[in-house]
């Protein structure tokens, strides 16, 4: 069976708004998606009605049934073009919709869509304007091979709230996604801006988080449907790539892009954590948070953004500290690691390390953190921050000269710290790990603006150095585990791990001196 593994978060591809059926060509969707627990359905209805009444005093809810059939080819060619195709049925009306590539930022979904009323149960791509397709899009081949992938059936309760120069349409959807014999519950609230105020939409979202424990939703019904049908995999992102920047970007464009990139990485891994909990997903989530933090710090220094967001990110990160112990133990027990073969000879010690690794995992605690009001509020605030993208005169300046100076100033501090001592001990290296990692993340933000070869030649020894410093933690853990033992191997093990620590320090010293000789890439 063909399987599509998204190269970027699936939530960027397919998400559907809830406008009434209409004759129209193109619209730009802008909606906030929030998930609620099915058992909170009655409470959610009451809260939504209360919010609607408070805004207009006379808002009436309407309720109707919707059925959506989603189409693609067996080899998922629409999905590969970042497109989603459906036919929506409501009573005797049918509407055919194609969704093109868009973006998702903290639950806010933006995506162009094209709609046309139809009579058939099967979509006809030739009814859309031919100008919407990419140059290499094989319309007729795809049309010939279309088939139903999955369907959604749900009850929609809708309120239209006056806001700004338009309305915010608030809906509660309850029903099922069906793919063959597999089904999954739909229970979500969406807030669509139809000329309404962004501030109003986010204010409503914060109230729903507070009153019904709503969660920001980055996966659409369609993304979930593809997974349910076995057509798409949700895999954690384990590697942070350079933020995709262009040389003509302004400072603001580059920094907002970095925050958005980090948030997408974070939320994709959060979705992986909730659907299939794993340490890899938590690691990816933590990496995304750190990239957001680094870029956000620069924006705040330049006068935009709330410092409270940084405080919230720090508190979330504090609750992921167990990852350090897990990664240290993983360094010792991984089959492709440097210590596996030697430690495997000491069966009881090796089993103890493996058991300890399992014991430090806190996936349930991370799920509780993700569900917390603080976490959800932080994501919503970041989402609004990215949608609004406040600009100043300074943020409107070209990014290249600014980031070159930033990287230079930041690296001078790191370089001084690493070169002020002729020789560093373990504690000295551990103290320098955080500023080194921070500077490497700064390079992740802006590295795309520089020559690939020169950049990698400079970064590689520093990345090796960071990995080696983290390895010190692993050997500290090993030292403590060995001391807890009481058998004939104790002295031999202590001597062996002492040799490993001495060997590691020699390697770190070599890497440090090699790294300090490299010429910075930002002035190449």
What are these regions (language model features)?
Residues 1-24:
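N-terminal amphipathic/basic-hydrophobic helices that include classical n-h-c signal peptides
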